[in-house]
Amino acid sequence: MRPYNVIVVMVVLLALVLHAVLSQHWSYGWLPGGKRSVGELEATIRMMGTGGVVSLPEETSAQTQERLRPYNIINDGGYFNRKKRFFHE
């Protein structure tokens, strides 16, 4: 390559790298520069003003029973037998 072509390629690569490095990452709920919106800050301050206690809605008894129900245990002999590979053997 001629020196002119090498310089052009280097300038293009530098521009691409600078574009990637200087671009800002936008996440959900965040503004550029890592700042949150004022509405979320207000809600956080209000919650802190209540003593940090957040009231949760009451659960129905069916939801509580579903959450506390134990898993079904199919087989207590949970060891691995290398010789027995298939169920029919």
UniProtKB/Swiss-Prot annotation:
Modification type Pyrrolidone carboxylic acid: residues: Q24
InterPro entries recorded: GnRH, Gonadoliberin
Cited PROSITE patterns: GNRH (PS00473)
A Pfam family hit: GnRH
Superkingdom to which the source organism belongs: Eukaryota
Modified residues (Glycine amide): G33
A single cellular component GO annotation: extracellular space
Keywords from the named record: Amidation, Cleavage on pair of basic residues, Hormone, Pyrrolidone carboxylic acid, Secreted, Signal
GO molecular function, one term: gonadotropin hormone-releasing hormone activity
First and last residue of the signal peptide: 1-23
Location within or outside the cell: Secreted
PANTHER family found in the cross-reference section: GONADOLIBERIN, PROGONADOLIBERIN-2
Function: Stimulates the secretion of gonadotropins.
Annotated family: Belongs to the GnRH family.
Protein name: Progonadoliberin-3
Species this chain originates from: Porichthys notatus
Encoding gene, per UniProt annotation: gnrh3
